[in-house]
Amino acid sequence: MNFHVLTLFPEMIEAAFSTSITGRAMEAGLLSLHAVNIRDYAEEKRKGRVDDYSYGGGAGMIMQAEPVYRAYCAVADAIADRTNPRVLFMSPQGRTFDQTFASELAMEKDLIFLCGHYEGIDQRVLDEIVTDEVSIGDYVLTGGELPALVMMDTIARLVPGVLSNEDSAQTESFMGDGLLEYPQYSRPEEWHGQAVPPILLSGNHGAVDRWRREQSLLRTALRRPDLCREAVLNKKDRKFIRENGLEELYRGARNLD
């Protein structure tokens, strides 16, 4: 997976993405990062400035179309022989980013992220190059760099080989069946008067799997009831839901068997 980020702050992207799991994945050649400084494509007479006043007035400055377009073309031309990349513009007005969308994007070879700043970017260049406007939530940040990093981290985890344990990505919240992940415990067996659930010490793998599944069902119902109707359930799930009075929350959920 090749990530290309058009930004005014490439050092911010590089520093964050070059650590931990994503950093090791880059060293292993599973991921690559190309952070492009949009200022490098400013008109020479403007000496690196890429913003100007907004037509019609209003507070703040607007990123100009031409430097953004030049930066995009530099990336698109460099990878034109292998892909027609999606261009993702970080915007609170866009499609909400979720695990399903991440899985879709993880199938791409190259992704271009466009990070805005100031009061926004000239609409004309957005209309010309952007394929997807994407939001990570109903709030406003100072720039698109943090949303881009959130998306890149989520997508990177789905690239084969990035996680040392491939099962990790499949058992986490929102994956596959749409449920939240079950609670996790480690040593010691007792901490601050709280003991690890005995079932996890039993050695009965089938019982452990069932307990974890039931905890996922309960946790989703309690913490994210909005997800229940999109869950994928089996017969044992349905029985547990009936026994715990959760039918209404899970009404409409899909059947696995």
Where are these predicted regions, by residue range?
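Hydrophobic/aromatic beta-strand patches that form the interior of the parallel beta-sheet core
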Residues: 4-6, 34-36, 88, 111-112, ...
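Long, charged alpha-helical interface segments
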Residues: 175-232, 236-239
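S-adenosyl-L-methionine/SAH cofactor-binding core of RNA-modifying enzymes
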Residues: 64-117, 123, 160
